[in-house]
Structure formats: C-alpha cells, structure tokens
Amino acid sequence: MFKNLFKSSLMILFLMIGLSGKSFAQELKFFTIGTGGTAYTYYPVGGMIANAISKPPGSRECGKGGSCGVPNLIASAVSSRGSVDNVNAIISGLRNSGFAQSDVAYWAYTGTGTMEGKEPAKDLRTIAALFQEHIHLVALKKSNINSVKDLKGKRVSLDEPGSGTYVDAKLILESNGLSTSDVKAEALKGKAATDALRNGKVDAIFVVAGYPTGAIVELASAVDIKLVPIDGAGAKALTSKYGFFSESPIPSGTYEGVDQVNTVAV
C-alpha cells in the first residue's frame, strides 16, 4: 500500500522528527523548502507554497488582505540541484522540507535504487503529492535525433548528478539499450542547458518537470525545437520495471511549434 503512494507525482517531503523548523525567541519560526533550479518548475511552485503558509508577526489578518498562513511562521523556498539533493538535505537536517520526484522518494525511503547502501529514511514523510512530472527530451528541430536510440554518440546534457533528472535520464538510456558511456554526457542545468542546446554546444537535453516549464517555453520562442518521443519498447520496459513511471503525452501546443509527443512521467 505504501509503495502505491510513490506513483508518478512530485512530492513535498519532510522528516517526521524535524517538522517544527527553527525558532527564534520561542515565537518566530523558520521553515525551508528545498526546490530546484530557478529556471524550472520547482522554484516558483516552492515560492508560492512558502508565501501561502507564511504569516510573520505584524501581518494583516486573514481575509483582510493579509496572509492566512501559520502564525509566526516564515517559510522560504531554497534553490537546489533537485530531488536527490533535497532528500539528502532533509535527511541531514539541512532543510526542513523539499520537493522530490516519486522515484527518488521511494528509493530514499527503502534504501534501494540510487540510494542503495544508505540507511532507509524511514522517518521521511509526504506532505502532499503535487503534480506529474514529464520527461522532456529536447533537441533542435533540424537535428536527426528522433528517438532515444539516436542519442548514441551525441552530446547530451543529463543534468547534474544531484538531481532526479540525472537519475531518470540514466534509466531511460538503459531501458533503450544505452548507457551514459554511449553518449557524450554533460552535466548542465536550467538556462545553461537550454543555452548550450540553442548554441549548438550539445545535441539534446533531458528535463524532468511539470509542463509547461519556463526554460523550455523560453527556448521554443527563440529557436525551433522538437520533443523527442520516449515510447515504444523502451517506455514499456521502463514502466514495467519501475511502478512510479507511467506513459503520458505532452499535448500539442504546450511549447511553440511542437506537436503532441509521447513520453513518460514520474
């Protein structure tokens, strides 16, 4: 039953022993939310949640133009390298809470997958499941990359090793008979990744985010792009092996000039 909780969604997590946050003068409380890179979805969503739950001393009353948050709480969204970084920061006590992909949360809780060899984080708890995150494999429209297998020998940004995107990119390559050694892997994030693609420094980039995500919206408005399908036997193998992946399309028109594409979500 618990495993079913980790199906295809972004989660906000905390450690059961650390929910209260840091206090000052026994009244003012601080609560941090680990998010992701500022160019992607996590950071603005984290900022909205932080604003909604904050209610500093002296705030106007709820319903009278003031905050309806937790009295004397100041919450803040903190940029990070993403899901893996957030989970590790929560476990270590560096942050009070954070966003994590469902697969990363499951692996942390069970001490398996990318967290194999680490103590299972049994005190890790889910506050809410927020939304599905779709794997975007982005290339320039003029490129000859039309499937995951076409990435062989190409320059591909997998994102930073501390991110959930990096983990998922490796799994997608593996489910299509490739490994990181089959591509010229780069560890670029956010605007650095989209700029590298636009300027021809890389051939494709992986992005895991709710759609539409700002970095790709901006890229599509500047240059013709395509979303490369993640489907067929590779997607079936991935979703069969890992229950937290599901096949889910990104609709036509989500990004300028880009038709509907079949991909997977987590």
PLM feature segments, named:
Residues L19-A25:
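Sec/Tat signal peptide C-region and signal peptidase I cleavage site
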Residues F30-G65, Q132-N199:
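Bilobed "Venus flytrap"/periplasmic-binding protein-like clamshell domains
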Residues L28-F30, V70-N72, G82-D85, S92-R95, ...:
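Extracytoplasmic
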Residues G117-L130, T254-T263:
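A structural signal for short loop-to-beta-strand junctions that line the ligand-binding cleft
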Residues S102, G113, S179-V266:
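Pocket-lining segment of extracytoplasmic ligand-binding domains
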Residues S9-G18:
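Bacterial N-terminal signal peptides
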Residues G63-K118, K191-A196, Y211-A220, L238-T239:
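Pocket-flanking alpha-helical
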Residues M1-L10:
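Bacterial N-terminal signal peptides that target proteins for export
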